[in-house]
Amino acid sequence: MNIIQAIIIGVVQGLTEFLPVSSSAHLVFIQNILGVESSLAFDTFLHLGSLLAVLWFFRADIIKMIVSWISSLSDIVHGRFKEGFHEDPYKRFAWYVILATIPVGLVGVFFEDSVDALFSGALYVPAFFLFVTGTILYLSQRMTSGNINFHNVGPKESLFMGLGQACAILPGLSRSGTTIAAGLVIGLDKEFAAKFSFILSIPAILGAFLLQVKDIGSAMDANFLPIILGFIAAFIAGYAAIKWMLELIQKRSLDIFAYYCWAVGIIVFMGSIAHIF
């Protein structure tokens, strides 16, 4: 992999990790188009770039959540967990993010081999699920924005968001797309649905990073420059994608992403069937 290819793949990873168009599908597509196969080390650093982008963007919220969550552990010891839980929205939200992460964790543990088999299959699999992503986005935009936000979100909404994220382990289903759609269906405010989706991605991306980093050892490339440039590209593109999505979801519909997913899904599906790709 040369430097230009590394930067292109890094940009694609960063953008599609947070835009509702499926990073898994686009990484498969772009690597087929470029005729390259990324190494484990490269993939690991792409995930690290995306992870740092969302951590840096929401750094103020993340710090408050961590401090509040640690405080809630102290509340448990001192027998005032319920009071602290109801008084501090950051304590509640930290626990709700943990709750919402359980479904994807269970799917990852028990169905990892089955999912890996789908990723190694023909391109029509992610193409099909990309079309499904478009349909989910389109239907979700027909819903009226709810009034559930950071201050009144509960376990039911959080778990539903988590189930949406668990479904997105399938190649071609957008993680941000399914979680935002799940939030809108369950009655979340549009802006909060997007914010919850992005913060919820942190444990998922961190989990993927840790699973890869434990095997990275001897797989480290001798040429480290493409890895570093891909990492930087993923970080910058990821940060920009989060900022754009939060602005876009307040002002406009996400239908444009639905149309895009349909178009790309159909083109790649037909191309795969015809053995063009």
Protein language model regions, located:
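Multi-pass membrane proteins that catalyze or facilitate reactions on polyprenyl-/lipid-phosphate substrates
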Residues: 1-277
